[in-house]
């Protein structure tokens, strides 16, 4: 199933997304971010939906979140998302934004590859005794039962259920299901490649970004490096789960900062201090996951962040002790 939605409309569909998580129904959701909250700025650029995409829905609802950086990335990200959704029986959110949605880019005509496809669905008769949610103890994966499949009759429900798909409210069944759905994220994470650093592998400052800010960040980093600054950048495509090796990359730099199009408090404001400062979305994730002091700078002016602005911000951060 493929669902395409602007950010505001997607919030109205959280119950359906939660059903897909609980029932382990493959689903790709394309979320085109724009200014919010509420009606906000319908035609303006913003990156305010990351945390909603990852944590949205009541209860524990693990989802994969991919953020393409270019028009070409958008094409291939949907292919990747569908393959992951069908391989792991999960919800995959493709998190794009108004900047990409309203842009045009020429790229080489794609040549079809068998690698794009998920493994074919096994539609053979279900062997006696095989359970519809026969979760693997390590990966959480289970064979997908298809409606109408011989021997595959089962209940598809948003209620907590056991391995037989029967509604079950007992503590053991509920915890077993949650563990299985969570382990699928870990199983996917182990297949991901460590992202490539743009610039040197170590230095004074690492800029981390996601989504459509990639071009502006790399242009700024390239100019700063031409001036002799020991600055590099890292752009993340997988936001949930995050690829392996990110912590080790960050540890090679004296300072780490995220550049994003969502809100973060300015520490220069009189009322803001370290006890009440709100960090940007990606900085919040990185700080909590890797326990590294990640700083952030963000802009929510309804327009793409400019390379010159990023250069200025990075130079200011380099001067700070």
Model regions and ranges:
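Generic structural motif recognizing short loop/turn segments at the entrances and edges of beta-strands
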Residues: 2, 46-49, 62, 152, ...
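Short glycine-enriched loop/turn motifs at secondary-structure junctions
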Residues: 59-60, 201
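Thiamine diphosphate
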Residues: 1-55, 64-86, 226
């Amino acid at each position: 199933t493929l669902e395409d939605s602007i950010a505001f409309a997607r919030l109205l569909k959280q119950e359906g997304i939660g059903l897909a998580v609980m029932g382990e129904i493959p689903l790709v959701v394309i979320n085109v971010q724009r200014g919010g909250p509420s009606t906000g700025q319908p035609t303006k650029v913003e990156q305010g939906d990351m945390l909603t995409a990852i944590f949205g829905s009541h209860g524990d609802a693990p989802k994969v979140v991919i953020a393409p950086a270019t028009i070409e990335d958008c094409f291939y990200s949907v292919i990747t998302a569908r393959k992951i959704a069908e391989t792991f029986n999960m919800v995959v959110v493709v998190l794009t934004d108004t900047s990409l949605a309203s842009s045009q880019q020429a790229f080489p005509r794609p040549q079809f590859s068998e690698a794009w496809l998920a493994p074919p669905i096994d539609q053979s008769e279900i062997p006696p005794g095989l359970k519809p949610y026969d979760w693997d103890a390590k990966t959480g994966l289970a064979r997908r039962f298809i409606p109408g499949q011989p021997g595959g009759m089962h209940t598809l429900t948003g209620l907590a259920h056991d391995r037989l798909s029967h509604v079950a409210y007992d503590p053991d069944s509920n915890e077993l299901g949650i563990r299985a759905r969570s382990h699928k994220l870990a199983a996917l994470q182990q297949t991901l490649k460590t992202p490539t650093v743009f610039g040197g592998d170590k230095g004074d400052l690492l800029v981390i970004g996601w989504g459509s800010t990639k071009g502006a960040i790399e242009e700024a980093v390239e100019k700063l490096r031409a001036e002799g600054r020991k600055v590099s950048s890292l752009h993340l495509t997988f936001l949930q789960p995050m690829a392996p090796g990110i912590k080790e990359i960050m540890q090679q730099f004296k300072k780490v900062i995220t550049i994003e199009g969502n809100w973060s408090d300015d520490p220069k404001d009189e009322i803001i201090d370290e006890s009440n400062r709100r960090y940007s979305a990606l900085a919040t994730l990185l700080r909590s996951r890797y326990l590294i002091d990640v700083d952030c700078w963000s802009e929510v002016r309804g327009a793409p962040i400019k390379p010159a602005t990023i250069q200025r911000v990075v130079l200011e951060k380099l001067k700070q002790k």
